[in-house]
Amino acid sequence: QRLADSKGLTTIVPTWFHVKDTEGNLESIASTDYVNYAHQAGLEVWAAIRDFDGGIGSNDESLQLLSYSSRRENLINQLIGAVMQVGIDGINVDFEKISKDCGVHYIQFIRELSVKCRQNGIVLSVDNYVPKGYNQQYNRKEQGVMADYVIIMGYDEHNGSSLEAGSVSSYEFVKEGIEETIKEVPAEKVINGIPFFTRLWSETPKTQEELNQEAGTEAADYPMKVTSEALGMSTARDKISQAGAETTLDETTGNNYATWEADGVTYEIWLEDATSIEPKLQLMKENKLAGTAAWALGQESSDI
């Protein structure tokens, strides 16, 4: 139903593949019926393979997997086999547990996978964080040579483990991601991902005991204890309405923003909606990117 309701969509990326273990065995929930339905709707299917959320899930495990050529080969062969069997059009690599030590092995995996993809007519795309000094090991420049598309995850600027509340995807964060990526990757190969979700932040002052426990850590610099939950666009709007709060434009982030208090807790939310997304789409057009991606289908409001 989500596919039928979505306009302007060309490609769907279901999270069908996980790395089962460090030997490179594959876990798959790929569906031929789904692929056939998507093809009838005029959509390509690029199935995602992940190194988290099922199967392996740590930097150490990804290193154990990728640092052996036999394990890489095992994973690639199983992956290509599953893709061909179900009639999938592309593979999307979403590996987010790559340490500095693992970088050279990771890029070798992408290199080897790209050869097999070309031989079998499979589109290869690779997901990437917004470029920062601490994630250079992903080697976007080499990815840009070997992959068909390099996808920027232009969100999680503030995420579930953040020590302070903030926007999931501010305008400047997205701008930086695009500008830094196209320094290394041809723009016609770059797709920028935007969020169809936001976070509702809950803040309470830390107790003296909590502050004492955090002494000497980065967390000690933040006097508020912060938790958050991810919400789709419509649910986020509903939360604001239920609280009787007003939204105002936060010109720093480009998001509509709301805050309110209840039972000693301060709530904050930076909305993702047409107001925040339109300028980001304009950035993508100006930089002549290959396209736009979003996480995740079904979280958007009807106007999007």
Language model features with spans:
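Structural recognition of alpha->loop->beta junctions
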Residues: 5-11, 67-91, 138-158
